[in-house]
Amino acid sequence: MQRARIKLSSTDHKVLDEICRQIKEIAEKTGVDISGPIPLPTKVLRVVTRKSPDGEGSSTFDRWTMKIHKRLIDIDADERALRHIMKIRIPDNVQIEIQFK
C-alpha cells in the first residue's frame, strides 16, 4: 500500500500540535497505520538591525527572531482517511505538504 508523508510547518507550535492531534484521531478512527508526529529541528531566523538611523551615537541594536516549527507524519494512503484529513480546517499560518511514496 502507498504511504503519504505529511509535512507541517508553522510559527506557532500549539496550533501545529492541535492539527497533528486531529490527524492522529482521524487515523485511529479509520484504522490506518500512522507513525508520528515526529518533531523536526526548529529553524530560528534572526535579524539584527541598528536602532540609530544615521549611524551617530552609541551602537545599539534591535534583535528580531522568528522560530519555524516542523512536524512529520507518515500515514497509509487510504482514500477515506485522506479525504477526512483534507477537510481539517487549517489556519493561514500553517503550511502543509503531502507527498505519496
UniProtKB/Swiss-Prot annotation:
Keywords: Ribonucleoprotein, Ribosomal protein. This is Small ribosomal subunit protein uS10. It comes from Methanocaldococcus jannaschii (strain ATCC 43067 / DSM 2661 / JAL-1 / JCM 10045 / NBRC 100440). One of its GO terms (biological process) is translation. GO terms for cellular component: cytosolic small ribosomal subunit. Coiled coil: none annotated. Part of the 30S ribosomal subunit. Involved in the binding of tRNA to the ribosomes. Belongs to the universal ribosomal protein uS10 family. Signal peptide: none annotated. GO terms for molecular function: structural constituent of ribosome; tRNA binding. The gene is rps10. The lineage of its organism: Archaea, Methanobacteriati, Methanobacteriota, Methanomada group, Methanococci.
